Amino acid sequence: METRPFGPEVWEQLPPEVPAYILVWEEALRQALAKIAQLEQRVNELEARLNRHSGNSSQPPSQDPPQAPKNRREKSGRNPGGQPGHQGNHRELAPPEKVDKIVEHRAETCPHCRSALQHGAARQAPAVERHQVWELPEIHPIIIEHRLLAGWCPHCQSWVKPELPAEIGRSAFGPRLQAWVAILTGRFRQSRRQVVELLRELCGVNVSLGSIQSLCEETSEALAVPYQEAKEAVAQADVAFVDETGWKEQAKRRWLWVAVTRWATIFKVSCSRGRKALLELIGESFEGILHSDRWGAYNIVASRQRQICWAHLQRDFQALSERKTRAGPVGAWGLREIKRLFAIWHRYQAGELTWAEMRWELVPVRLRLGKLLRQGACCGDSKAEARCRNLLKLWPALLTLAFMPGVEPTNNRAERALRGAVLWRKGCFGNQSDNGLRFTERILTTVATLRQQDRTIVAYVVAAIQAHRTGQVASSLLPTAPLFIKAA
């Protein structure tokens, strides 16, 4: 409240009822101004909530409101399709030894004079033009009948029947068909009913819903040991990209965690989103660098061992820049620094900068970010202040990429690994039992890890099922030599 426009001597000369009247209205004005400030803050919060979209929050694009701004790239001015100088793609002709059937077409008459054409003439004929058509064969299941022929024992005076070989067991389905069921479910995200229909329509095999579930559970058992081995290897990883998303077991809330490492991609379904679930995934002895967002469970790992995802921070600063308070300039400044950071990183990825040069160019960005966060921590906007103070606490985790080779500015690897699982969840609504949860973990881990290493999925799963049926252990998912993460 500003001071009165007159001095105490004037105040003392006023009639007694006038100062009393002024004091009443001054108090009313103070209360009104306080209420206005409170309502303005409330309006800003509601507007920020109304304006939330995938560009300024963690909200997925599928939940964006109609008025959300479209993230459109600037037009390049080029025509769509192949550009001048682009080397086109075409199908290479298969070698003759791989051709199943050859059909020769001969011209019989000349299109100009209608004369009969001669074949095998002495003249040099032009080169034979070849055109190949690729087709799928009609699939018929191979049905193998195993007959158990009893023999008579003259000593015991009884018939003796043989046992089925261990690799056959009592299953009505072979390892390859079983592997198809597991892969159609876990890799191609088909529901149990869709798998039944696909096998019937494409392969001519009738399988019941109950058999589909039994085959998935048996495959899960076959993959149990390699899955556990890959999961235990996370603790020895030098870098791990970790994220989590919601999952369901019947009507119960569950969480699907993922850890992408140099050697493998591990999935784990847990009952919580807390620290205990994180330690179950990465192990208590984890000493590498953890890529993550700012979810509280990750604080169990020291900041010097973390790299916060700058894609998440970019959305946070975008939200601050849209606030009609003192947070706006803080958010705009943060966006400028993030743009500089990504520009430097992209130049490093393109080979224009060495790692040492990238570190050097990040020094001024790091200094400006520190200044920004210190100013934002006392800017007068509670939202911006809380965010900046939180980032100051996590300061060692903001630019770990400048001190550790192999560290990236975003957690995109983990988020990309979860996308297929999210689509599967939306199509199948989660799992209905604990066995289903274990199958989800193991088949997702197996498929993602094999794709990461460019290994054949079907061949591995078939071999794992064959080993399981004979009481053996499937081969390891981990490579014999360290592999770098396959570029997505």
What are these regions (language model features)?
Residues 1-169, 242, 248, 292:
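Short, flexible loop/hinge motifs at secondary-structure junctions
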Residues 30, 38, 91, 107, ...:
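Catalytic center-proximal scaffold of phosphoryl-transfer enzymes
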